[in-house]
């Protein structure tokens, strides 16, 4: 058989890495549920008509079809199915289909795989897991949710920092109305074209962006310079407002965006000082978000790009009679974890869940070991029974190779009694008598821990 090669862009973790992901997922789920977000799971496929509404994603959609499809199938392209490339499209459909059974504002979290047929590279995958939170209203959605949503995600990321040693994060925020109003105030008829060039600011620099605006969009030197100047503005307080006004552009939409952005930044930084930065060069997503837009970077690992982004949709979903506005944030879980795990910067303290290996005296006495294991499991202690009744030295070596910290030795059976059981910490060599109905491992050994080497 030919040697198997891994498929690029479809990351798979060894058990120790998967346990790290599971641990991170539990933290996210606990945090989201503490804030009242309900879990949902949507199907993997959606009609192509829905998936291709975002034109720029067309080439990245995986189409689903049967290998031996009916050659006479006359379905049009819109009736074909594809794998979802994010969780927003299926969520919008879910809201429309279940609106009569949901109570609004509806708060949901969703941790699920998505698929994109893009060229694999570090930080970009063809199959990956996202963790999304959204709050959706019926007809209206109060602005305070633009504050609440990032605070919930920041709370989850702070737990990853304090409990697992993840770097701290900074959330950058802009507002679609601010940027669009500024460009319209300059007399620019196509603000989206400007946003597409400004989106390259970090990659090519301000001078190159200015040149693109002049050469490709025929902006005047003065207008191009002001667009670049706007993109350079950042602050954690309201000083960004004065800096924008110094550029001398007047527009009602601009003022609305400034006020809204200021309220969001002030409220978030009051709760978690310094975690949110008004960053007016954020352009990605402003072509479909209608208000606030977020991007999040790991401190000291900015080269990874945004690991968490989102924003407000004034029309997340609509059935013609009802409009459902929403605000949400998506954490790229695989994008966050895969590079870290591959570099060994985060790992599990052991590669198996078991805290105890129950040794087997003889194969004839295996039932005794199984009874002990059942007693331990009934009290929430993960354990497994040795696969063979080898010499105890070999059974200890088996536990050591699997990273299991304790070995349980059943007492030897005699004609009318059985010796006391003992349990050994194979790291220290300490061995004590123990009762499976009462003994507990140290709390830190009960479940695998996560070790960071950042």
From Swiss-Prot:
One of its GO terms (molecular function) is histidine-tRNA ligase activity. Keywords: Aminoacyl-tRNA synthetase, ATP-binding, Cytoplasm, Ligase, Nucleotide-binding, Protein biosynthesis. CDD domains: HisRS-like_core. It comes from the Bacteria. The keyword Acyltransferase does not apply. Gene3D superfamilies: Anticodon-binding domain (3.40.50.800), Bira Bifunctional Protein, Domain 2 (3.30.930.10). One of its GO terms (biological process) is histidyl-tRNA aminoacylation. Pfam families: HGTP_anticodon, tRNA-synt_His. It catalyses: tRNA(His) + L-histidine + ATP = L-histidyl-tRNA(His) + AMP + diphosphate + H(+). GO terms for cellular component: cytoplasm. InterPro entries: aa-tRNA-synth_II, aa-tRNA-synth_II/BPL/LPL, Anticodon-bd, Anticodon-bd_dom_sf, His-tRNA-ligase, HisRS-like_core, HisRS/HisZ. Transmembrane segments: none annotated. Its EC number is 6.1.1.21. Belongs to the class-II aminoacyl-tRNA synthetase family. Homodimer. PANTHER family: HISTIDINE--TRNA LIGASE, HISTIDYL-TRNA SYNTHETASE. NCBIfam families: hisS (TIGR00442). This is Histidine--tRNA ligase. It comes from Cutibacterium acnes (strain DSM 16379 / KPA171202).
């Amino acid at each position: 058989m030919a040697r198997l090669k891994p498929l690029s862009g479809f990351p798979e973790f060894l058990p120790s890495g998967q346990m790290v992901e599971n641990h991170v997922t539990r933290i996210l789920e606990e945090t989201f549920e503490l804030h009242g977000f309900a879990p949902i799971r949507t199907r993997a496929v959606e009609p192509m008509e829905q998936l291709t509404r975002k034109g720029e994603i067309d080439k990245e959609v995986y189409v689903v079809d049967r290998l031996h499809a009916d050659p006479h199938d006359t379905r049009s392209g819109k009736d074909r199915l594809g794998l979802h490339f994010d969780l927003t499209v299926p969520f919008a459909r879910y809201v429309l289909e279940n609106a009569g059974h949901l109570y609004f504002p509806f708060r949901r979290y969703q941790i699920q795989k998505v698929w994109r047929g893009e060229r694999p590279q570090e930080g970009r995958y063809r199959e990956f897991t996202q963790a999304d939170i959204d709050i959706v209203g019926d007809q209206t959605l109060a602005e305070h949710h633009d504050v609440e949503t990032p605070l919930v995600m920041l709370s989850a990321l702070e737990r990853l920092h304090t409990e697992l040693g993840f770097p701290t994060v900074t959330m950058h925020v802009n507002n679609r109305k601010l940027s669009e109003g500024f460009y319209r105030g300059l007399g620019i008829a196509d603000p989206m074209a400007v946003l597409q060039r400004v989106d390259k600011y970090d990659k090519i620099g301000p001078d190159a962006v200015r040149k693109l605006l002049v050469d490709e969009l025929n902006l005047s030197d003065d207008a191009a310079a002001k667009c670049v100047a706007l993109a350079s503005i950042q602050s954690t307080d309201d000083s960004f407002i004065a800096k924008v006004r110094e550029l001398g552009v007047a527009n009602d939409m601009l003022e609305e965006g400034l006020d809204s952005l200021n309220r969001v930044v002030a409220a978030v930084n009051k709760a978690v000082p310094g975690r949110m930065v008004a960053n007016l060069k954020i352009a990605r997503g402003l072509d479909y978000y209608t208000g606030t837009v977020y991007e999040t970077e790991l401190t000291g690992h900015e080269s990874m790009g945004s690991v968490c982004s989102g924003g407000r949709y004034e029309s997340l979903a609509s059935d013609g009679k009802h409009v459902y506005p929403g605000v949400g944030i998506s954490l790229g879980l695989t994008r966050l974890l895969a590079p870290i795990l591959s570099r060994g910067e985060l790992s599990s303290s052991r590669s198996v869940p078991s805290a105890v290996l129950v040794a087997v005296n003889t194969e004839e006495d295996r039932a005794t070991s199984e009874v002990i294991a059942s007693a331990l499991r009934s009290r929430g202690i993960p354990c497994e029974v040795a696969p063979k009744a080898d010499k105890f030295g070999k059974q200890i070596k088996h536990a050591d190779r699997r990273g299991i910290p304790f070995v349980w030795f059943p007492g030897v059976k005699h004609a009318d009694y059985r010796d006391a059981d003992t349990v050994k910490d194979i790291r220290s060599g300490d061995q004590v008598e123990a009762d499976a109905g009462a003994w507990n491992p140290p709390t830190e050994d009960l479940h695998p821990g996560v070790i960071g080497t950042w």
